[in-house]
Curated annotation (Swiss-Prot):
Protein name: Coiled-coil-helix-coiled-coil-helix domain-containing protein 7
Residues in CHCH domain copies: 12-54
Listed PROSITE patterns: CHCH
Species: Xenopus laevis
Gene: chchd7
SUPFAM superfamilies, per the entry: Cysteine alpha-hairpin motif
Length: 84
């Protein structure tokens, strides 16, 4: 699978919504980054959160390291609020 296709795949990219929101903000604001800072922070926090999950699963020997989309949904539902 190509890198671009993998980044658009919900199973491979847990932060697809945040990616799309950041891109949309940039498009709507003529690429003025300072107007989209909150979107960038949310994306960065999303990547940090799922990277931590991947590291934990790798340490525990759980395969695949990145949970599938359905499993990620269950993980987020088990938390009281969105961690990012």
């Amino acid at each position: 699978m190509s890198r671009i296709r993998r980044m658009r795949d919900l199973d491979s990219n847990p932060c697809l919504e945040e990616t799309d929101a950041s891109t949309k903000c940039m498009d709507e604001n003529q690429y003025q980054k300072d107007l989209c800072t909150s979107y960038f922070i949310k994306y960065k926090n999303c990547r940090k959160f799922w990277n931590g999950i991947m590291i934990t699963r790798r340490r525990e020997g759980t395969v695949p390291y990145m949970p599938a989309a359905e499993e990620r949904k269950q993980i987020l539902e088990s938390l009281e609020s969105l961690p990012y």
